[in-house]
Amino acid sequence: MKKAILQRPAQYRIKRAIITTRTEEGCIHRMYVAGHSVGRARVDLSAAQGDPWAYCELLYIEPEMRGQGLGTELLRWMAARYGSVVVAPDNRGAQRLYQRLGREAYGREAYYYIDQGFGVYEIM
């Protein structure tokens, strides 16, 4: 049912919104299309400590809404807001998504989780 909402002709101009809720550690960004929740991202800002990037703990698009560019749109929105996003080296799905967007790792950071390295992907 939700998928049909996005398949209307372009002349109907479907309203999209991203609503942000602050948490103690960072933010939760919820994406809505035509009033329906279609996805969310949870961003940890406590790891950044003043640096121009954020750790994206979660990026989730409802299964029936995937393949329509909503995850890409949410990532681009976060890139405009935060600059860069950090991705764990064992998160292959996120790394593939960033690489499909034409982004590559430009460094290794032993940041926040000292015993783990994080590949940093610019998504702007």
Task: Describe each PLM feature range.
Residues 3-53, 57:
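Acetyl-CoA-dependent GNAT
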Residues 29-30, 89-92, 109-124:
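C-terminal "cap" of GNAT-fold acetyltransferases
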Residues 37-39, 71, 107:
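A structural microfeature
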Residues 57-66:
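A short, internal acetyl-CoA/4′-phosphopantetheine-binding micro-motif in the GNAT/acyltransferase core
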Residues 65, 69-77:
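Conserved acetyl-CoA pyrophosphate-binding loop and the N-cap/start of the following alpha-helix
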Residues 74, 93-97:
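Conserved short alpha-helix immediately C-terminal to the canonical SAM/SAH-binding motif I
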Residues 80-92:
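Conserved GNAT acetyl-CoA-binding A-motif
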Residues 101-108:
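Conserved acetyl-CoA-binding loop of GNAT-fold acetyltransferases
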